[in-house]
Amino acid sequence: MTSKEKNGDYTLQVCDSLWLNRSFREEIRKKIAEAPLKDKSYRYSDVGFILLQMLAEELSGKPMDEYLWQEFYQPMGLEHTAYLPLRYFDKKEVVPSAVDRFLRKTTLQGFVHDESAAFQGGISGNAGLFSNAREVGRIYQMLLNGGELDGRRYLSKETCALFT
């Protein structure tokens, strides 16, 4: 399922020297969808946010990163908020985020630290978004304003109440 270089079916980059088979993302999503629901116990899981991403992509007809860029980040004037930042910025502009001694065995710079997000190609409902303090501040200001920023409504007040 992995390769040390990009070739053929290995197109999802997990770090500088690790590529994942492109079928892995869909296989994982299929397993999530088919997993039986158990009740009466709590266990932390990213699955809900991954399912939320799948729902958003289905409803919008767009990949999540594209939808968020068009509907939120670009209109909000966010120029440094993106998934897969190495597509847009030089590596020296991206702060290293973690040292992965377990799986990828490298310092992660421009790659999501969360393994489940990394193995979905770096774009996931649970992790993978990179930004800077100023732009995170603008997103939170929009939430504090009940979904509005600079005179434009992005989210309903009810959605903001649920988020916060």
Question: What name fits each language-model region?
Answer:
Residues M1-T164:
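Short, surface-exposed loop or secondary-structure junction motifs
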